[in-house]
Design a protein with these regions (language model features):
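TRNA-recognition modules of translation machinery and tRNA-sensing kinases, especially anticodon-binding
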Residues: 1-257
Length: 257
């Protein structure tokens, strides 16, 4: 039997962060430099947090079992980072009302939806929710912060567009699209051959959501966005299939050291 010297020094393989972690930390740094607080929130939430506090009525299709993972105890896996909005509004609302300190916070995390996977959809994905509430906040403030963030992430001006979109917790609501950097806007499977990739649902926080969070919508307005970190990572690193990110392929991850 061959003898082995287990005390002999060996070369240690260097680890690396997952590219979603890299993108998340970069976004956190950017928003932090603009005065946003970074918050964490549970992946298991209540029906109230995920739906009722966000102006989503009982009959809304987002509550359908085919979209949301429900647990036996009545709680659920959060289907969007917006589930933290109510808690954030209540946490920072006192400072806004008593001291005039704007509410500015981001809260990244995993989201879960019971849906089929393809090149641009997964049942587990990462988002970064952001909110800002103060007097006289408008859509122009939302556009400014999102354009600033994207320019910092990609180190150049990025072509974006706003499309009208319906989300019960914002009014008006929009879809923020980014020109597909994988195909240069010409069309590919990742962007469904449209030249655009949906990146971020956003809009002005609905008065009912502000009111539920203890904020008077007659005095204050605010915006919210749900930035898709997974898709942002795809765009930044030129990944054509979202499923690669959760594949556990060490060879693929090593290139992002």
């Amino acid at each position: 039997m061959p003898q082995f010297d287990i005390t002999s020094p060996v070369a240690l393989a260097r680890g690396s962060y997952h590219l979603i972690t890299l993108v998340q930390r970069e976004c956190e740094k950017i928003f932090s430099s603009m005065g946003f607080n970074i918050e964490d929130y549970s992946e298991i939430v209540t029906d109230y947090e995920c739906f009722e506090a966000l102006n989503i009525p009982k009959h809304h299709p987002a509550r359908d079992m085919q979209d949301t993972y429900y647990l036996d105890n009545g709680q659920l896996l959060k289907s969007h980072t917006s589930a933290a909005q109510n808690a954030i509004l209540k946490k920072y609302g006192k400072g806004l009302i008593e001291n005039g300190t704007p509410i500015k916070a981001i809260f990244p995390g995993r989201c879960f939806r019971n849906e089929a996977t393809d090149a641009c959809h997964e049942n587990t994905f990462f988002q970064m929710e952001g909110v800002m509430v103060d007097k006289d906040i408008s859509i122009s403030n939302l556009i400014y912060f999102m354009k600033t963030m994207l320019s910092e992430v990609f180190k150049k001006d990025i072509k974006v567009r706003l499309r009208p979109g319906f989300f019960p917790f914002v009014e008006p609501g929009f879809e923020l699209d980014i020109s597909c950097l994988i195909c240069g806007g010409e069309g590919c499977p990742s962007c469904k051959h449209s030249g655009w990739l949906e990146l971020c649902p956003c809009g002005m926080i609905h008065p009912n959501v502000l009111r539920e969070g203890g904020i008077d919508p007659e005095k204050y307005t605010g915006f919210a966005f749900g930035l898709g970190l997974t898709r942002l990572a795809m765009m930044k690193y030129g990944i054509k299939d979202i499923r690669v990110l959760n594949s556990g392929n060490i060879k693929a991850l090593k290139q992002f050291k």
